[in-house]
Amino acid sequence: MRFFVSCAKGLEYLLVDEVLALGAAGATATVAGVNVEGGLCDAQRLVLWSRLASRVLWPLAAFACADEDALYAGVAALPWVEHVLPGQTLAVDAHVSGEAITHARYAAQRVKDAVVDTLRDAGVVRPSVDVEHPDVRLNLSLRKGRATLSVDLGGRALHHRGWRQAPHAASLKEHLAAAVLLRAGWAKVYAEGGGLLDPMCGSGTLLIEGALMVADVAPGLSRYADPDAMSHVSVAERPVLLPSRWRGFDVVAWEALVVDAQQRARRGLAELRPVLHGSDIDPRALGAASANARAAGVQDAIEFVVAGIDVLPAVSEPHGVVVCNAPYDVRLAADPGLYRHLGDALRRVVPRWRAALVCGSNTLAFATGLRAGKRYQFFNGALECVLIVCDPVVPLAREAGGAQALSEGAQMAANRLRKNVQRLKKWRIRAGVECYRVYDADLPEYAAAIDVYQEVDGARRLFLHVQEYAAPTSIPEGDVRRRRHELLAAVRAVFDVSVAQVALKTRQRGKGGSQYGCFAQRGEFFHVCEHGALLRVNLFDYLDTGLFLDHRPLRGRMAREAVGKRFLNVFCYTGVASVEAAVAGAAATTSVDLSSTYLHWCTDNFALNGQGGVRHRLVQADALAWLEAERGQYDVIFCDPPTFSNSARADDFDVQRDHVRLLRAAVARLTPGGVLYFSNNFRRFRLDVDAVAAFAQCEEISSVTIDLDFSRNTRIHRTWLLWR
């Protein structure tokens, strides 16, 4: 006999394995479920034992269904006196797709009408409706003009285990928790003496499911436990009710299954070791977790501690599994920073453990900074999630700072990196440079720019920012990936950093040309220093980092010239030039940008250096329009526009087309003796010398604004000095 077992999307193949392990003759995955070959006893065993299934549906009939009349007739043709006893309660669930019948509730009503009418005509007391706890629950699937009517052998959704005493916001459903534990290989780790840790355990779902799984407790024992039984009685001793009172249900087989399951539960609970650890920052959540664990009979195996992720509970087991349903969407606004802190904590406390983390998206998974060996998609209700498995949290080759053997290509790249580091060493020490470009496509086959950022506080970590250049379409994608991995291996080996300290921006080929792929969204900011100013940078979340390294010498020159003067920075980005001018002693600064994000970043940079107030003004505006309306005068002006920009709040800007208008407006704001520095990185830019000569004197000074680390690419930007 073929019957259907439904599950959450993404769990189908796990469910196939479970169904076969529980004795079914065959199983085939389909969307959100599994078609199973087996008998009624096999189906009832799944009701009792499956940790993954949502429902077990035993078919009663399948028939063509062109419209509501055909549906009614098909249902009425069944001998309902053989399925429903007089006076029993009934419920009908319906799932419809297609054009014949479009409303599931109406379809369910027509099924109920057909059943009731048939029983009434047979002289049987009609069943009443009980949608919560019916004696018999029917399930209608109507798809592509064909109806399948089944009896729901479990009587209710099987993710209900019966032990949950107190609901908790956005708890992971129990069958999804079981899937996480199975993907993590928890049972095998437990058998080898390992432990289980959930640092954001909430109401304890993952830990309780983990305990019941290794204790060999069937989920159906607590789900169908007699509610009148004493709550202090072990789940292995409580009377177990029938999940369905459908007349075809094999009561004798069910009772035999229950007796066997209770015997196994007694043994498993008696031998269960206390190696499960949970923590959460919310004491109320832990109160619910403790109550749930008591109801499940596993309270002695789980230790609950009130703590945030920065203070993980101490674990004595040398190895184990970390599981976590990190907050996303409904429970808390998705916070990449929280995911980053989680990854940092796991690397620090349990580097050799395996981790299986439920994340709200791939972006949030990337934010952990952990290297996922495996990645799975599934649905928690309507929410699509990603499960990452990291085994171990810190790979052995990474823990020692990248001591793994390098391939021939990676070794070649590493040699070039070491050579560049040595070449720049004396200059960096003399100039006090801590953030610099160490590589710029020196080897053509490894086409990327690599920048080094030295953290100035905390652990003084070293970070690497790797920006891959677009590969020619003639190069196979496999070669592109191989070279990328070799270059990253070289970076980690030379600079002795973990994968979490390397930010990679890759180019992805598409119809619109090469575009950078999605960024990590780790929310990880740290501080660096340039020319005595502290600066906030983020290597992971944006295309740029908050600090254009190539403008370093120009910023230093302007800061020296701005001492005691008024400094204007248009298209200010994160305001680094303004901050350095303020730190150097500028009398006042004005910073203009259209982006509120960058202006907030600029505000943070000023605050880091104890600067701010009315002397340092930030203006959110279209820079060109603001310049043309401004009447103030400035001694030093810095103008570094983008090549092109468009915005719903401002006119489109094209540096080649609009630079004369821009420079005219900026020069008009200069005081007598004032200077304007104009820079851009458009490689094909041509200054309209004749037009500019009509209102200013001009000199190109690009060569003196390029430091040694950018000497391989002197076209990284061009700079002109203008004065009246």
Swiss-Prot record:
EC top class named in words: transferase
Pfam families: Methyltrans_SAM, RlmL_1st, THUMP, UPF0020
Main location: cytoplasm
Transmembrane portions of the chain: none
Cellular localization per UniProt: Cytoplasm
Catalytic activity: guanosine(2445) in 23S rRNA + S-adenosyl-L-methionine = N(2)-methylguanosine(2445) in 23S rRNA + S-adenosyl-L-homocysteine + H(+); guanosine(2069) in 23S rRNA + S-adenosyl-L-methionine = N(2)-methylguanosine(2069) in 23S rRNA + S-adenosyl-L-homocysteine + H(+)
Function of the protein: Specifically methylates the guanine in position 2445 (m2G2445) and the guanine in position 2069 (m7G2069) of 23S rRNA.
Name of the protein: Ribosomal RNA large subunit methyltransferase K/L
Organism: Xylella fastidiosa (strain M12)
Organism ancestry: Bacteria, Pseudomonadati, Pseudomonadota, Gammaproteobacteria, Lysobacterales
Gene name tied to this protein: rlmL
